[in-house]
Swiss-Prot record:
UniProt entry keywords in alphabetical sequence: Signal
Keyword tRNA processing found: no
Additional facts recorded: Preliminary crystallization indicates the presence of a single beta-propeller domain that contains 7 4-stranded beta-sheets.
Assembly mode: Monomer.
Annotated protein name in UniProt: Uncharacterized protein YncE
Length: 353
């Protein structure tokens, strides 16, 4: 009995030590895989530059206390702030022209767009996109998503409202070239296939709209689901090589994969209601933020299955990728309401893929 008891005690001790080592190993791996840093209040979209080796974050700051906002330049490895660019207008949406190294930020509440030199942080110019004064009857359209065509130095900006538009801006002189009309209710989603000369937008009418960027005319519009349910296709990201679009729905627990040639649905990926989506051609994966669930999903673009989930409380918002596709960045918002603003700054998470 004594020998058996001694053996059992040693065995239990070995198993406990082994379990602790495994847990420690997983914890260390998780810590190496994910870095989280508090940056500033009102965090929204990001832009990454390989040339400048930097990540920029648009923040609107406090709704009540701050008139303007701040664009933070971050070290993409440590997430430390290396520059704070103060603006009198609040920035929300973000993109970058990698050829001209010009950052573009949508000033949603002012119906404007601001161009900033990525190298210096100097404001290059600003353009008011809808100069109508807000009244009870008039609601100026608000810029939401931005995409830059490096080849033509053109910036496309979704202007959302009951009947949305897409503004087409000359990146050289920062002037409005044209506005593509009738893109539906709240056409928030925006994605560009520069080589194919196609621009895609999605809206709260449940449509995918295809636009020819050669003449800025709508080529087609298709209601993606005819199931009698409400859908808000809020964001879109392209796999241009395989002519696929990954589309998030804030009203349904699924992500759609759509053939961009005809609008046919290739797959429905089960996932919580979604916000941002970003396709990574280097890994053939798509990343999706689930604002209410507080998670980020990794979708295998071959099997159309969620293969990994990251816990990113409280409200994961926007996504950005490093140029090599090996690092994912997530902006994460704290709980905040109109009555009670968040007391702590919002975060940026760096995930090693």
């Amino acid at each position: 009995m004594h020998l058996r008891h001694l053996f059992s005690s040693r065995l239990r001790g070995s198993l406990l030590l082994g379990s602790l080592l495994v847990v420690s190993s997983f914890s260390t791996q998780a810590a190496e895989e994910m870095l989280r840093k508090a940056v500033g209040k009102g965090a929204y979209e990001m832009a990454y530059s390989q040339q400048e080796n930097a990540l920029w974050l648009a923040t609107s700051q406090s709704r009540k206390l701050d008139k303007g906002g701040v664009v933070y330049r971050l070290d993409p490895v440590t997430l430390e702030v290396t520059q704070a660019i103060h603006n009198d207008l609040k920035p929300f949406g973000a993109t970058i022209n990698n050829t001209t190294q010009t950052l573009w930020f949508g000033n949603t509440v002012n119906s404007a767009v601001t161009a900033i030199d990525a190298k210096t942080g100097e404001v290059k110019g600003r353009l008011v996109l809808d100069d109508r004064k807000r009244t009870e009857e008039v609601r100026p359209l608000q810029p939401r998503e931005l995409v830059a065509d490096d080849a033509t130095n053109t910036v496309y900006i979704s202007g959302i409202g009951k009947e949305s538009v897409i503004w087409v801006v000359d990146g050289g002189n920062i002037k409005l070239k044209t506005a593509i009309q009738n893109t539906g209710k709240m056409s928030t989603g925006l994605a560009l296939d520069s080589e194919g000369k196609r621009l895609y937008t999605t809206n709260a009418d449940g449509e995918l709209i295809t636009i020819d960027t050669a003449d800025n005319k709508i080529l087609s519009r298709k209601k993606l689901l005819d199931d009698g349910k409400e859908h808000f296709f809020i964001n879109i990201s392209l796999d241009t090589a395989r002519q696929r679009a990954f589309i998030t729905d804030s009203k349904a627990a699924e992500v759609l994969v759509v053939d961009t040639r005809n609008g046919n649905i290739l797959a429905k990926v089960a996932a919580p209601e979604s916000l941002a989506v970003l396709f990574n051609p280097a890994r053939n994966e798509a990343y999706v933020t689930h604002r209410q669930a507080g998670k980020v999903s990794v979708i295998d673009a071959k099997s159309y299955k969620v293969v990994k989930t990251f816990d990113t409380p409280t409200h994961p918002n926007s996504l950005a990728l490093s140029a090599d596709g090996k690092t994912l960045y997530v902006s994460v918002k704290q709980k905040s309401t109109k009555q009670q603003e968040a007391t702590q700054p919002d975060d940026v998470i760096r995930i090693a893929l």
